[in-house]
Regions:
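Catalytic centers of hydrolytic enzymes
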Residues: 1-154
């Protein structure tokens, strides 16, 4: 795990999973517009490096600049193939913790709770993904190394 003194490869235990997902949240599938995705990311970086609203993402990339004013920090949002995600009404399907769908951590108004479909517990989804990845011999990518989130200023 990044941020520990452990050296890869290492085992992921049930205790690790419960430490990462201690709150019993479920995964929700929702739709978000490009415009609201940008706004949600702005919310996520608005208190950098403060509170816990910083987003954990997959399937796209974004860059931000903390020297810019709050509301103008996100510099780019792209799909992993490099295609730009515009601040428009195009809709994207996303998986997101239920507490964010319902406005937790300041994520108010970005998702439509009545249209969200709640799935399993986050911890169970995580355990299933790690089990599948490790049994199939796939490498588990450490997010800090794949460039999903880039802070453009020092």
């Amino acid at each position: 795990r990044p941020g520990t003194d452990k050296v890869a490869p290492y085992d992921v235990t049930l205790g690790d999973a419960l430490a990462v997902y201690p709150f019993g949240n479920t995964v929700g599938v929702s739709v978000i517009t490009g415009e609201n995705l940008w706004k949600a990311l702005e919310n996520g970086v608005s208190n950098w490096p403060g509170d816990g609203r910083f987003p954990q993402i997959s399937g796209f990339k974004f860059s931000f600049d903390t020297t810019k004013a709050v509301g103008s920090r996100v510099q780019s949002v792209t799909k992993t193939d490099g295609t730009a995600i515009a601040k428009d009404s195009k809709e994207y399907t996303v998986a997101v913790p239920d507490f964010m769908i319902y406005g937790g951590d300041g994520y108010v108004g970005f998702f439509t709770p009545s249209k969200a479909k709640l799935r399993g517990l986050l911890v169970d989804v995580f355990i299933e993904a790690v089990t599948e990845a490790s049994s199939g011999g796939k490498a588990i990518t450490i997010p800090a190394l794949d460039g999903r989130i880039t802070k453009v200023n020092p």
